[in-house]
């Protein structure tokens, strides 16, 4: 599946037109959008001729767009856990949503990896880092990591 690489496609956009306008005491707003199964050209500013995304296109014009990224896992929960923890999948232990023991045990081809359904409380996460820097955080939508 070609879009698997882009499961953790995200945009980090600063809300001001020109980051050089910040004084040393000002901090930029950060909008981190993490989208599951977003294709490389599914957004207007990335060249989509099918989908219309005018508001995201405007954000992209005013901010910073990252176009070179790495998906640390082949599905949503472990990728999200890696993004928020900074750890690779074997380090945080979130391999899938729910149990990895799916389907009929007799016909299963692989031994399921032991899976955690959440990040350990001891893991220092990106939202905690941002909070310590004075940011207010919010999460909307899917979570699946604790």
Region roles according to the model:
Residues 2, 16-146:
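Formylglycine-dependent sulfatase
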